Amino acid sequence: MQLPEEFVNYTRKLMGNELFQHYLDSFSEEAPVSIRLNPLKVEGGGLKVEGGDPVPWCPEGYYLPKRPNFTMDPLLHAGCYYVQEAASMFVSHVLRQYVHTPVVMLDLCAAPGGKSTAAIASLPQGSTLYSNEPNRNRANILLENITKWGYPNCIVTNNYPKDYRASKLRFDVILCDVPCSGEGMFRRDEATIGEWSKQNVERCWQLQRDIVSDAWTCLCDGGLLIYSTCTFNTKENEENVRWICEEFDAEVLPVDVRPEWNITGSLLPDFSAPVYRFIPGITRSEGLFVCVIRKKPSPTPSLLREGIKGGKRSCLKEIQMNQQHSYLPHREGPEVGLSYPQAIAYLRGEALTLPADTPRGIVTVTFQGHPLGMMKNIGTRANNLYPKEWRIRTTHVPHEYQSVL
């Protein structure tokens, strides 16, 4: 794998020879595979990860010994777990440290939904999450993942940051996982190497500042901005954090981490604020940068709930979840358990013949007790109501079920 020469020269100088060599060595290793369990569905349900090592900063996270065929696991489609890179689970650790009462949170650049599902599972009960994605196609993928995750207190929107600024909605916590040059993903996604350039780095840090500027107006006094990228360079990381602090008179907050997690701090000599950098070969993860920034309280207290009520949610493009598909653990109506071959057939959109004593009408079909979706039983057969855009498209079906959990 050939890394861009300009990237190598800059990053070696930034990290130092020893750290950079560990990073280079990581390319000869298999990238770790990790999942995060859904506490709404798994806790107390007897599901566990066989042979998986815990992700130390996320109690629901596990490293897997090898990468299974996730597509062919009905429990993935049921929202029992989410396949997520381990470093990205760090957002749950941040939220659990700083958020202890119900809040309204915005994930501004949320697709495909990993950090949103981690956030909604980590926030105190009674919280609300706005999960937003500007790109329409990616927003539909986000909607699918949020729906399957099964938390009712999540609103999916398809808007640009400037639309949120115009809405006058206010949030206690805003996650800005901003578009970036992707240097931290080089090992996992070789295509990102070909997309990298110094010019793209320049475009990214400027775009990131525009996004943060829009987000900042939506943040309540005393609220938290979680700024993250999946890149290494300081222009998109430390230098942007310093700009945020100077531009908005903000302060950086520390996050409790353990030495054995091998998370790296600031790489900018004249910048000592607490930031958290995950480097492949050092940390058991791909690349990530995280910083927690607090908007200083105003001399005049702001009332968040009044701000939410006074905002213009109607001006946002909200995407409605499919009301026929409930992924909540507590549900009403008849249910039919499916075998593994039946579950795969259902997820492929095929019609099924249900047991003779199945009531006519809408029926929830489940796998190992977890709902996959709905069918309409008309007696001679059951019509498949699983959304077409969610269906498994591969024709290969394994002979036996290889469970992840």
Where do the model's predicted regions map?
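S-adenosylmethionine
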Residues: 1-405
